């Protein structure tokens, strides 16, 4: 299923189907940050299912139960919050793609949304990795007005931190794509997710569908240098 991308004009008329235009080898080694749970884990499942070589950065305390159930996935131990640790992770392999779905929590704080992602971005650049897909959230950057007031009140700080990471990636010189999901749920992929450039877009989307959009964006040159909101069609 090709990515469905809505531009501001096309969004008023119809969904625009963009044919995949791979700029990377069919099997591109991918390093995933945030791959032990949520969107990251779903992304790892899809990439591994396609035969991609996937490595996930994991902490010593990470629960690897779900990852261990996926064939062909490698892990490297490190901490995204530790710059030296991230450097070692990149040195441990020859990666062509980085996907980061890092995010904090109410209990652990949200600095990983900025510092962790920035470390991943800098590590990729230093290692010569060109392709970087970053997952943040609707409400960050120019999509702030799309987020409902209760969401802004509850997640204001996390959105600020995510925007710092977005700005850093935009200025990095990498071949980047930023995907901002709306309200996340764990429904199966029974509804079509879309990528839209409308910064005013808001809606729900399953983690599994966000993962599909990520994997289909990786080699699609049309998504390079673009910021999208991800919602159900």
Model regions and ranges:
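Sec/Tat signal peptide C-region and signal peptidase I cleavage site
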Residues: 22-28
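Glycine/proline-rich active-site loop of Rossmann-fold NAD(P)-dependent oxidoreductases
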Residues: 188-193, 217-226
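Conserved Rossmann-fold cofactor-binding substructure of NAD(P)-dependent oxidoreductases
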Residues: 74-96
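N-terminal Rossmann NAD(P)H-binding glycine-rich loop of SDR-like oxidoreductase domains
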Residues: 30-50
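Conserved beta-loop-beta element that borders a ligand/cofactor-binding pocket
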Residues: 166-188
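N-terminal Rossmann-fold cofactor-binding loop
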Residues: 57-62, 80
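Substrate-positioning beta->alpha
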Residues: 116, 179, 201-216, 226
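NAD(P)-cofactor binding segment of oxidoreductase domains
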Residues: 96-132, 163-164
